Structure formats: C-alpha cells, structure tokens
Regions:
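Active-site pocket-lining/capping segments in soluble small-molecule metabolic enzymes
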Residues: 1-150, 156-299
Length: 299
C-alpha cells in the first residue's frame, strides 16, 4: 500500500508560463488539491535539442530560469533525451551537453534524464554522474518479461512501460515492492490500443530532431486524424483515471504516474492538472486564478 501518488508532468520548457502560475497555487492553496497527490517531476526539452525524442520540443524559455523555478518549489526536473537514433558524433552536441551540466549542478532535488539510447546512457553516466535515469516509454515495452528485465537494471530509477501493460494486474502484482517503486505508468495515452506503428512514429520524431529529411509518419489508427482528445483517451483500455489510482494502484503498492502532453496546448495541460490533482469543488478556483475572469470572451 502506498499513501501518495507522484505525478510526473509534461512541459518543463514548453509550459513554463503555466507552471509559473500553477506551482504557487499548489503550494499556497494546498486545500484545492487532493491530499494523496504530489508532483514527482516535470519533464521536457527545449527547441532544437538533437538528443530529444518522443515529441519535438518547442520550449524557448531560458534553461536557467526554468531550473530556478523547479528549485524554488523543490521539484525534480527531467530532460527528455529519448532520441533512439543517436550516433557517436551526436554526443558532442554543445547545447545538450550544456543542459546536462546545468541540470547536474543542482542536487537537491536531484534532476534526471528520460532516455532511450544505450550510447547516450553510457555517455551521460560517465560525464554527468549526478543525474538519474528514466527508461523511456518510447522503447515500447509491451512484453512483460522485457519490462521486468528493464526494471531490474540498476541504471534506471524509473521505468515507463508501454501503456498496454497498465492493466496487466496479475503480472504487475508479482513484482516486489522495490520493483513496483520503479514503475511509472503512462496514464492518459490517446494512441490506439491496437497500434503496431508506435515505434516507427517515435523514430520519425527522432529523425526530425536530428535534422534529417524524412517523410511524415501518417497515423493509421481509427480516428487518428482527429488528434489528441482527452475524452477519447479516457475511453482507452489503458487509461488510468483518478479512481484507478486511488482504489487500485496505490493499494497495490504503485505510486508513480506519468501524464503525457508535451506536444499539446497549455489549455489541455491545465485540464490534466484539474482532473488528476484538483478537488472538483476547487477546479473553478484554479481556473479563476490562472485565466478565467468576468471579461473573458471565447466567441
């Protein structure tokens, strides 16, 4: 049994302005939020990071300001460096190395890297030993045996499996408590549950981040052209809602939950924060503090 759920939130660079408004609320008005939830980390990557993966980063905020905000609120910052196609010549990239140096400098709380490439893992372990590692969901670990092997690797503090493992309760319950503490479930994936192209989709993002000229990946999923809809994500067989977290996962001994959304708009990220962390009777208070006033026009 675990008492607290730790949410790992998207948009470290991409949604800096949103968090600059939300984090003071989370600290000063704790009564607005569920007492069983905390912020475990905020993750992301700025624009033009060749080590980036999963999504193309678009944050333009100054990394020192971003890190200063995280330090002020005692939140671990994670660099999303999950490019799966890195080669030796990419390891010398000045921008990505500078980010690692900066993020390694602060040890309380410790900052981390979400990673795919074994080459990059070994490089960062040697060059920036003060950073911890998260095994990226872009590895698409759908086989439970492979997932267990990943959990047992000492390199990783956390492992994010593919969302299709989320409800494999019989197998998940065979893990030891130490292993359960390393599992970080992806809660709100909108991708089609039967998708076979997930890895190819992520590889296209990796190629784009490397600046390669590559064809677009065209999603073949039913309703894929509609893009991300939170309502559709909630219907996904792998979706983890707040009742699931409180009534199933915490009692089973799991406590880490990742919210996706780096490539979405800030309005949708706010909806995630409201749904997963905010008591229903206070959601209007959070909206009013962040954007809603008597003169706001939508049409």
């Amino acid at each position: 049994m675990r008492e607290k759920a730790y949410f790992h939130l998207p948009g470290l660079f991409e949604f800096y302005e949103l968090y600059r408004m939300f984090l003071p609320l989370f600290r000063e008005h704790r009564e607005y939020f569920y007492d069983w939830c905390e912020i475990g980390s905020i993750y992301g990557a700025p624009a033009d990071c060749i080590w980036g993966g999963g999504r193309a980063g678009f944050g333009e905020n100054d990394p020192e300001e971003v890190l200063e905000l995280m330090q002020e609120y005692g939140i671990s910052a994670r660099l999303t460096f999950s490019n799966s196609l890195l080669r030796q010549e990419h390891l010398s990239d000045r921008k990505c190395n500078a980010l690692c140096r900066l993020f390694e400098r602060n040890r309380e709380p410790q900052n981390g890297v979400i990673i795919y490439s074994e080459l990059l893992l070994e490089y960062i372990k040697e060059q920036y030993p003060g950073l911890y590692f998260v095994s990226s969901t872009t590895k698409v670990l759908t086989d439970f045996t492979q997932f267990e092997e990943e959990i047992r690797r000492k390199d990783f503090r956390y492992v994010v499996p593919d969302f299709r493992i989320n409800k494999a309760f019989d197998k998940l319950n065979t893990l030891s408590q130490a292993e359960k503490d390393k599992v970080e479930f992806l809660c709100n994936e909108c991708c089609w549950f039967g998708c076979r192209d997930r890895k190819a989709c992520y590889e296209t993002v990796s190629r784009k981040n490397l600046g390669e000229n590559c064809p677009e990946h065209h999603c073949k999923a039913p309703d894929g052209a509609r893009g991300y809809l939170f309502s559709k994500a909630m219907e996904n067989p792998g979706f983890i809602g707040i009742n699931d977290i409180r009534d199933i996962y915490l009692p089973m001994g799991f406590s880490n939950f990742k919210i996706e959304g780096r490539g979405l708009g800030s309005a949708l990220i706010l909806e995630f924060l409201l749904y997963y962390m905010t008591r229903s009777e206070y959601q209007i208070h959070v909206r009013e503090k962040i954007y809603l006033d008597s003169m706001l026009d939508l049409f």
